[in-house]
Amino acid sequence: MFRRAKGAIPMGSDVRHVRGEAQKELVKKFEVFLSNGRSRWQVWSDWITVSAIAVSNATDQSHFDEREKQYLSIAGKYTRPEMEAFTEMLALLVVALEDNPEQDFLGELYMYLGLGNDHSGQFFTPYHICEVMSAVTTPTEEFQQKIGDRGWVAVCDPTCGAGALLVAFANECRKKGINYQTNVLFVAQDIDYIVGMMCYLQMSLLGMPGYVVIGDTLASPSVSYDKRGLLPVDKGNVWYTPMLRTPVWQYRIFMAQMELVTQPIRKERVADAPKSEPQKSPEALKKLEKPKNTEKPKAAKRPQRAPEQEPVFSEGKGGQLSFF
C-alpha cells in the first residue's frame, strides 16, 4: 500500500474521485509539476513520451537512436528530481496494472485530468462498455478453431485510443482460457501520437504482443508485407511491444520473412498471351461492327473478391475490431 502524502493538492483536484492508492499517488506526483508553472498537457505528454521511449528502447534497437534523441530533448527541460518523479509515476502505472489488469488506467486518468477537453475534445469509451463489446466480439468456438488451425490470430483496432478495447479483448481471451501472449497478435493504430503512446504503454505492461502504428487510419491505414500482419510497413511510426520480441513471436516473424524471400516470381508465359488473328478485309470488318447503342450505359457490377482474399472474420462480427 502507498502512503498518502500530507498537505493540499496544488490544483485543487479531489483525489477521492480517483480509484486505488496507486492512482491517487500518481495524481499527486503529477500535480506537483503544475506548481512550477507547467501546463497539464505538457507534463502529461512529456511523461507519456519518455516512458514509452524507455520501454521501446529496452528491446527495439531499430529505432533506438532517433527515440533516444527525443528522450534527451525532453529530459533537458526537467531537473533530475523531476525526471526521477517521472520514473516513480511509471512505477505506479506498473503497480496499478499488476493490481488490476482489467482497466483502462491511462484512459480514465486522461479523462479525469481534463486532458480530453484540452486536447482535440477527445472522449474515450468507458472500460466497462469495452468489456461488453469484447464479450460479444469474441466468438469462442470459431476463434479457438482458427487458433487451432493457424496457431494464432491477429486482432486490429484502427482507432485504438488508449487501448481500452484491445485490453478488454485480451482479458476476455484470458477468461476463456486463451493465452493471448502466444495466440493473439494485437495491432493498434491512432492518429494522435500521445494517445497512441498511452496504448503502447498499456499493451507493453500487460504483456500483449503486437505493435502500435501512429497515423491516420483513413489516409494511411496500417499495412503489412505479409498477409497476417507480422511484418508491418515501418516508416518510423511503428512501436513494437516487448512481448513481440519473445522467441515464439520472433520465430513466426522469421518464418514470415523467409516466406517472402522464397516466394516464386511470377513470369509471363507465352501460352497465356493473346494469340494473333489473321487480318480481315474491310467488308468483313463492317459486318463485325456493332450497332450504335443509344441507351445509357448501365453501371458496371462490382467484381466479387476471390475466396482467398476474403477476411478470416468479417468486420461485422468484430465491430470496431477486425480479425485476420
Where are the language model's segments positioned?
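Detector for methionine-enriched segments
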Residues: M1, M11, M83, M89, ...
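Intrinsically disordered, low-structural-confidence terminal and linker regions
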Residues: M1-V18, K298-F324
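Class I S-adenosyl-L-methionine
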Residues: K6-T159, G163-G177, L321-F324
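Residue-identity detector for glutamine
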Residues: Q23, Q42, Q61, Q70, ...
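Generic preference for hydrophobic/aromatic residues in regular secondary structure cores
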Residues: K28-E31, V184, V238-W239
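Sequence-level detector for tyrosine residue identity
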Residues: Y71, Y78, Y110-Y112, Y127, ...
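Conserved S-adenosyl-L-methionine
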Residues: I129-D234
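S-adenosylmethionine
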Residues: Q202-G319
